[in-house]
Amino acid sequence: MASSRRIKQENIINVKRVSIDWFWWLALIAIWAISTWFDRTWLSNDQRLPSWDQAEYLSSALEHGRGLGLLAPGEWNGWQGLLDLSPKIPPLSALISGSVMAITGEASDKASWVLSLWHGLLIVTLAMWGRVLGGRKLGVLAAVLLVLSPAMAEHRVEFSLDLPLTTSCTLALFLLFQWQRPAPIGGTWKQAIAAALSIGAALLIKQSALLVLALPSIWVGLRALPVKPRRRQTVVSIFIVLSLLMPWLHHNWITTIGGTQRAVLISGAKEGDPGILNPLSLIWYPRLMPDQLGILILTIGIAGIGLALWNNRKQIYVLIQHPVKILPKGWPWLIGVTLMGWICTSLSPNKDARYIAPVLPMLILLITKGWLLIIDQAQKKIGRNKSWAALIACILVSGFLSIKQRWEDIVITAGSPAVNVLETINRLSKGEQTTLFMVSSDRNLNEQTLSYLGQINGRNIQARRLGRNKDHEELSLAQSKWWVLATGDQGTSRKSRQQLSRAVRKDSRFELIETWDWDDNRQIELWRRRNTAEAIEKFDNRFIKLARGLEKGPAALEPIFKEIEIQHLLDPGFNYQQRVETWANNRLQHNQIDQDALWSLALLRVLQNRPGKASLWFRKIESVSDEQNWASIYNLTVLLADWKTCKAAWLADNYLKSTFNKDESNLLFALRDLSRAACFDPRGPIGLATSLKPAIESVEKQINGDSI
């Protein structure tokens, strides 16, 4: 009888636990559903056009969806073709967004459903983390405060990488926390693999995930090394992360470095953000917290934590000395990773307000603990019912303030007649592939916005912004057909752009098609090349001549790539490349040593980021040349770009057995030593100490002494 009674009691307890879990999950679903309903309502009322970054991310998602073959008129072109679509930013978020677009639609509001999915995952992750730290109440309340946070509410409706990055980093840190816990709770293979996959996924969304994940990962890894099972798990986890990153990084590492430099170093300097050594860096983000988290949410949280510290003020010194021993389990980890993320983000040269987003969920967990501490104190003073009523009132007030702030940000007009311009072009061009040129950089009229809008709803229009250089004016006029110009302020103060606008209006080759009223007494004008004007000259013959100029060495590189850069603006589809490739292959069928064709194909492969194929063409040029030339130098360079460093070192040794001029020999010695160093050959770093300076001097001599 006693045993049956005990079994019955255990069954009742299990049923209660299941019921509580159901209520907990239903609460999270309700939180997500209510916040998503508000977001969709906000999006349906806000009519603004996607601006610079938003439009660029939408275009990237569109391209990746087409690259997967999920969106028309795209098709699957292999892994390399897919990796070509993400030269500067990792592709995971764009791949997910493009896949969701295939279901929801390509328009920005419909594509934003992917943000709701990221938001749901963030709610669950934060709630589970809170539940581990302080039970169900902490988890649910953290989810509520997350939804009410003004910054997170903004990220939920702004199509960018901020919400995907925040979600992936929070998930990675939570799974890393679970794995680093003492056995048998932590330290399992499943936890290690899950943490590794989540870290890899976060890095494949944006490189800046390193700011939040690098130090915690190193911290956990160092703690795991003395423990044999965890040491093996650490090695396997590192292998998993590298395996996820390497395909994209190997394909795009050069453009990634260049893009990161512009986005972080150059952009931060232009915006006047404090440098790494500037003390203002450390208070840059804390001063934004009232606006980011909400003044009431932050005040109550800090008050609760401050009250707890005051009540335990005699133990503060011991707490500072031994936080791991004094604080409840899990809280030292949360505080540690929050501080690491805040410090690393503060030290980044570019300090846009949204870059602190991955740290906000962890701050919200800490603030939520302060809320619960206030509730506990209130229960002792005024009773349980009144304290919970006060909590609900504070949540409602916070919700009202958050909704008020977001509602005031709604824009009920598009901001510019950009869609009307694109519809007119699409109608007149009969849906054919079209490039639209412009000089303006207004929030509602810029190349990113027009390019995205020009690629949806059956349109096939790309927009490009010209006028950065006065020398390009004549080339721009000679090779363009469609222009969109504006009167008044166009968001740019460069005289070269203003002069280009006037040149289009005065050029007899162009005619005004239509005008639209804009705001502030401005107008938008659509100009088209007259049918009677001379035909646009193709770039094919000029490209062949430029490619042959590679024979002249480093002196030719800058003018070659400068001209190709402007041509890629004029021809964003790179249509000339297919024509040149067809021409070159036909020439080689009749003459296998045709130098124009060989150099053209080699340069094409370099521009297409196919270093392996470029190497084959440079070797072909070497084999048919009567004497040694710069093709050998280029071959080593593309092999290094392809990470085939050992092969490059071996080839350089062979090249040095032949006769080269002094400048070529200096470069060969430096490239050989660089290849050896990258191949972990100790002779490499030693040799670079003496070979690097002569190589640089030879390049400078070539540039200063020769011209194409």
Stretches found by the model and what they are:
Residues M1-R40, Q233-V241:
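Start-transfer (signal-anchor) and selected internal transmembrane alpha helices
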Residues S4, L28, L242, V318, ...:
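Signature aromatic-anchored transmembrane alpha helix within multi-pass, membrane-resident enzymes
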Residues W37-S44, A55-L85, L92-L95, I257:
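Extracytosolic helix-loop segments that constitute the early lumenal/periplasmic catalytic or substrate-binding loops
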Residues Y57-E63, G67, A201, I205, ...:
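Transmembrane-lumen/periplasm boundary regions of multi-pass, lipid-linked membrane glycan transferases
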Residues K110-L133, L171, L175, A308-N311:
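Transmembrane-helix motifs of polytopic, lipid-linked glycan transferases
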Residues S112, A151-L165, D352-A353:
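Short acidic/glycine- and proline-prone juxtamembrane loop motifs at membrane-interface regions
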Residues L133, A172-A192, A202, I374:
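Membrane-interface transmembrane helices that cradle and orient dolichyl/undecaprenyl
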Residues A418-T435, Y452-I708:
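C-terminal luminal/periplasmic domains and tails of membrane-associated envelope-modifying transferases
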